[in-house]
Curated annotation (Swiss-Prot):
Record's keyword terms, sorted: Cytoplasm, mRNA processing, Phosphoprotein, Plant defense
Lineage: Eukaryota, Viridiplantae, Streptophyta, Embryophyta, Tracheophyta
Protein name according to UniProt: Protein PAT1 homolog
GO CC annotations on file: Lsm1-7-Pat1 complex; P-body
Annotated signal sequence range: none
Post-translational modification comment from the UniProt entry: Phosphorylated at Ser-208 by MPK4 upon flg22 elicitation. Phosphorylated at Ser-200, Ser-342 and Ser-343 upon flg22 elicitation.
Self-association state and partner proteins as the record states: Interacts with MPK4 and SUMM2.
Length: 793
């Protein structure tokens, strides 16, 4: 304790005599001179140094300092009335005598010998940075500071009058509050500063409500003297991080700091100071949070130092600035304030509940209109979003955030979790679920008018997995590559394309496929909505809308109807349809389209006629890709299901489409290694017609159409069979004429190449003339062969 210069004078201080002298002096108009007491350094003025302001090699331990400042109960009880006055009086005197040493300690910039001018001098520091931010301190607050701090205090009458008030307001059992808090205390009244070099510490009971101002303190750890103001920091490198306070302002602090015992500033861990790096005059959030999280709630003002070290890590609320608020009753803010009430009051008065809403000129209004919420600061922080803004209020930011959440988080599993919900619905088909797999509402399909000269179309993402436009609509620039130079590779016939990528035919087909899949998703939504919702009109409007969507897809495919009544059927080349089905994803689109069309409708007939016109394009070549093979087989299965629900008229038109097509259908036997999809669907047509004819489920017009369609198909089938037989005989180097006995190898080739299943399915529909033609062909080609007789049985 010798470094502080108080090792011997502390225990020898005549506290009782000092109180008597102070009482005698307080009645007169003379200035209070604390230097007359040895307790204040009368004998050791020159030798005393203010602890912590000079760099020392030795760091004082917590135990040593605590032992020197362990007062007796009698000493504390006698000196707590005097400690308010003599605390910073000696500090200011020391600073006035040695201004060069403490030139970096804050707003004290000039040296003055008059002690009465100190308080007024501290009130003219408007050029200093504002601790709480410039938006809180306005011109009105500065004006109030000047008026308040400029009041004359020429005697000790005012001080003497305030001492009993403190005793009344804060009796002995309640004196431990602010000693427990371990935070800086500032007063708004000027102090008569005697020449003294010793720093005393006020007892907890002598702190008035006017001193309990809401300036946040710097977090600390126990073990040394804690200085209450950042302006008196012994660390020069910490000054840029800790902006000086505006002394004399009732908004922030008073005119004098109070120093605390056994609370070191020089022993502060660097990690706590690093938390202050983001502090600037306009940012008070870090000050607020660290001040509240670092203050220990002591329950006894005379807590032993050993207990203080463990308690300093506990959070503690800030105390509101009450000394400057008119009409406030100090009794409301006694030592029994709870954490929630004190922190809530601080939150309400200084506006820390929402720093975003602070505007210039609002600091004075916050002092006049004070609210006292019942909930604490922690609850206030939880209710707010952790963001601050400079130009927008909290309500504006929260409204924008709410709109974003509505757009991206609809809380509808059908939209946000579409694929997962679809898998669950597929696995639990037929089960009674609490939440059905259906949309909550149906959206209108937007009109996507696209121009040919549009460089980049709009990509709209509806939800997870629901992309109306594919990224292929806006291809990546890396796809725009020039072909290799023909001269470099010696290929004179290879010429670079002149068309840009967005004008390539296959790109247009891919874009159409994506648009078509999106349209079919809309149809799915309508079906699920109709399934799980009861509508007043029975869903008539939605059914019409559904049919219109499906018809629009057929129109966009440019599918012509040969049986159109208006006679204005479109061309049957089906160019766009062929482009779409040439891609595997296009075949998936066709599969889904057929599954959604109502069976037996005209739209089903139109689409199936287009399919039967292009059986070779769909089933002519068998791909080596297993996925493509699977898709092709699934397409054949779906077509068979559609045929099973047709009437005789649509069946007749589909069979006529095969005969009228410019493409030769691949008439292969079932199980052919090169694909039997076309034969499968043709056999389904013949079997469905036989079933309808046996059931007499037809009319005269229907049976006539069927006879005409079958006659054309049978003629085509016989021509194909004869042509295939000739090719087999030529491959085996046999005479082209019908032989009486064919070899075993020729019989196997006929079975392997002839569409035997189609011939067998045609028997119920042939007439007598067609039967004679067929039997003549069989007798001449397979006469006497026992191996081929079971084929036609």
């Amino acid at each position: 304790m010798d470094a502080f210069g108080i090792g011997s004078s502390l225990n020898q201080a005549p506290v009782t005599q000092d109180l008597k002298k102070f009482g005698d002096n307080s009645t007169g108009n003379t200035m209070f001179d604390a230097s007359q007491y040895a307790f204040f350094g009368n004998d050791v003025v020159e030798e005393v140094e203010l602890g912590g302001l000079e760099e020392e090699d030795e760091i004082l331990s917590f135990t040593g300092i605590a032992e020197d400042f362990s007062f007796d109960k009698e000493e504390v009880g006698d000196s707590r009335l005097l400690s308010d006055v003599d605390d910073l009086a000696s500090t200011f005197s020391k600073l006035n005598r040695e201004p060069d040493v403490y030139s970096n300690t804050g707003p004290i910039t000039d040296r003055r010998s008059s002690q009465n001018s100190l308080a007024a001098e501290w009130t003219h520091g408007e050029e200093l940075p504002n601790w709480y931010g410039r938006q809180i301190l306005d011109s009105d607050a500065i004006k109030d500071d000047k008026v308040w701090s400029a009041q004359p205090f020429s005697s000790l009458d005012r001080v003497e009058q305030r001492i009993p008030d403190r005793t009344k307001l804060y009796p002995e059992p309640q004196r431990q509050l602010h000693q427990d808090h371990n935070q800086q205390q500032f007063s708004s009244e000027p102090i008569l500063v005697p020449k003294s070099s010793f720093v005393s510490y006020p007892p907890p009971g002598s702190i008035s409500p006017d001193q309990r101002l809401g300036h946040p303190n710097i977090p600390y750890q126990s073990g040394g003297p804690q200085m209450g103001s950042p302006n008196f920091s012994p660390f020069p490198n910490l000054q840029p991080q800790l902006p000086s306070m505006h002394h004399g302002s009732p908004q922030h602090t008073g005119n004098r700091p109070q120093f605390r015992p056994a609370l070191p500033l020089n022993n502060l861990p660097p990690a706590q100071w690093m938390n202050r790096q983001n502090m600037h005059p306009g940012d008070s959030s870090g000050i607020m949070n660290n001040a509240m999280l670092q203050q220990p709630p002591h329950q006894n003002g005379l807590m032993p130092p050993q207990m203080q070290g463990s308690q300093n890590r506990l959070p503690h609320p800030m105390q509101p600035p009450l000394g400057h608020m008119p009409g406030m009753q100090p009794q409301l803010f006694n030592s029994h304030l709870s954490r929630s009430s004190s922190s809530g009051n601080y939150d309400g008065m200084l506006g820390f509940g929402d720093l975003r809403e602070v505007r210039p000129g609002s600091g004075h209004g916050n002092r006049q209109n004070v609210r006292f919420p019942q909930q604490g600061f922690d609850a206030g922080v939880q209710r707010r979003y952790p963001f601050r803004s400079k130009y927008m209020s909290a309500g504006e930011i929260e409204n924008i955030l709410r709109m974003q959440l509505v757009a991206t988080h609809s809380n509808d599993p059908y939209v946000d979790d579409y694929y997962h919900q679809a898998c669950l619905a597929k696995k639990s088909a037929g089960a009674k679920l609490k939440h059905h797999f259906c949309p909550n509402h149906l959206r209108d399909l937007q009109q996507r008018a696209r121009s040919n000269n549009e460089p980049h179309a709009f990509l709209q993402v509806e939800a997870l997995g629901r992309v109306p436009f594919s990224s292929i609509r806006r291809p990546r620039p890396l796809l725009e590559v020039d072909p290799p130079n023909s001269a470099k590779f010696g290929n004179a016939e290879h010429k670079p394309t002149d068309k840009p990528l967005d004008q390539e035919p296959m790109l247009a087909a891919r874009v159409y496929i994506e648009d078509g899949l999106c349209l079919l998703l809309e149809v799915d939504d309508i079906d699920r909505f109709l399934e799980f919702n009861q509508l007043q009109d029975g869903g008539h409007q939605l059914k019409q809308r559904r049919q219109a969507l499906l018809q629009s897809l057929a129109v966009s495919l440019q599918l012509g109807d040969p049986l159109a009544k208006n006679g204005q059927s479109q061309s049957l080349d089906d160019f766009l349809f062929l482009r779409v089905i040439s891609l595997p994803k296009g075949r998936k689109l066709l599969i889904r389209y057929l599954q959604l069309i109502f069976p037996g409708s005209d739209l089903m007939r139109i689409v199936c006629m287009a399919i039967f016109r292009h059986l070779r394009s769909l089933f002519g070549v068998l791909s080596s890709d297993p996925d493509i093979i699977k898709t092709t087989n699934k397409l054949a299965t779906v077509i068979n299901l559609c045929i099973q629900n047709m009437e005789l008229g649509p069946v007749s038109t589909c069979l006529a489409a095969v005969s009228c097509s410019s493409e030769q259908a691949p008439l292969r036997p079932l199980g052919s290694p090169v694909g039997d999809g076309a034969s499968t669907v043709l056999k389904s047509i013949l079997d469905r017609a036989s079933e309808l004819i046996r059931a007499n489920n037809f009319n005269n017009a229907g049976i006539a159409l069927w006879r005409a369609s079958f006659n054309e198909f049978f003629n085509m089938l016989m021509r194909y069979c004869i042509s295939k037989y000739d090719s087999i005989m030529q491959s085996l180097q046999l005479p082209p004429h019908f032989a009486t006995e064919i070899s075993e190898e020729a019989a196997k080739a006929i079975v392997r190449e002839m569409p035997i299943e189609l011939l067998r399915s045609s028997f119920p529909h042939i007439d007598e003339q067609q039967k004679r033609i067929l039997m003549e062909f069989l007798k001449r080609s397979m006469l006497g062969s026992q191996k081929t007789e079971p084929v036609l049985s």
